[in-house]
Amino acid sequence: MPRYFDVEMDEELIRELKDTLAYMVNPVTIDLFLDDESRCETCPDAYKLMKTIADASPVREGRRMIELRVFYKSNPEHLKEFERQKVERVPTVAMLDGMIRYTGTPAGEEIRGLIETIMRISEGESGLEPETKKVLASLPNLVHIETVVTPSCPYCPYAALLANMFAYEAWKQGNPKVLSDTVEAYENMDIAEKYGVMSVPAIALNGVMSFIGVPYEEDFIVYVKSASEGKLEELVPKTEGEASGL
């Protein structure tokens, strides 16, 4: 597979990362699902990236504020965690017992959205509007959000962050009915091709392409609610905000 991203960080970037993560309030656990390099060409890069991020987090009371747990598909003892979090592809980065996940390496522009997701979970605040929070607390059925992205897309982190915060807010309110899955297109071309993705971010809800571009929160919650209620076919796909060519 050609390299579509670079996971190396220079000293300045690592310093900026440390400065941001220094404001973490509560610890955050990140699960990294990998396989041997012979079966997963990008897994070493995913490990290198996530280890760099975890090591940049502050130490409080003798422990890192980002706890990185690593599970290998080749290790029989780790397979239960793959099954529990319903992880089928590697590499996968997961939080909140798999309700927020990155299928593929969250490199390039996606690092920004990942760090902001970590910070908001650490701070305990999704940043969503009160009405959005109210709807998320009462969703009846699971909504699987797939946000298809590329490492070079400058708009994709905003779409991924919004989806992540929908998942976090629902989880936080004890109604984990939103699974936010940020899919790196180049590592998962079959998913991008399934949805006919030509521009990113592209967002599918329960297997139905619903948005091209970064959705507005007030529109996104309408679609997520409809998907949860099985009424998504009543809405037409929308193009909002900015998008980049695949």
Question: Could you describe each region identified by the protein language model?
Answer:
Residues E77-D97, K194-N206:
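Structural micro-motif
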Residues K18, L79, K133, M189-A192:
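Short hydrophobic/charged patches on amphipathic alpha-helices used for structural packing
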Residues A94-E125, S199, A204-L246:
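Non-catalytic, surface beta->alpha helical segment in thiol-disulfide oxidoreductase systems
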Residues L161-A163, L179, G196, L235, ...:
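Terminal low-complexity, intrinsically disordered regions
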Residues V7-G62, L136-G174:
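Local sequence-structure signature of Cys/Sec-based thiol-disulfide redox active-site neighborhoods
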Residues V59-E77, Q173-D190:
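Thiol-based oxidoreductase modules, predominantly thioredoxin-like and allied folds used
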Residues M1-T29, E110-N141, L232-L246:
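N-terminal leader/targeting and pre-domain segments
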Residues F5, Q173, V197-S199:
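Acidic, low-complexity intrinsically disordered regions
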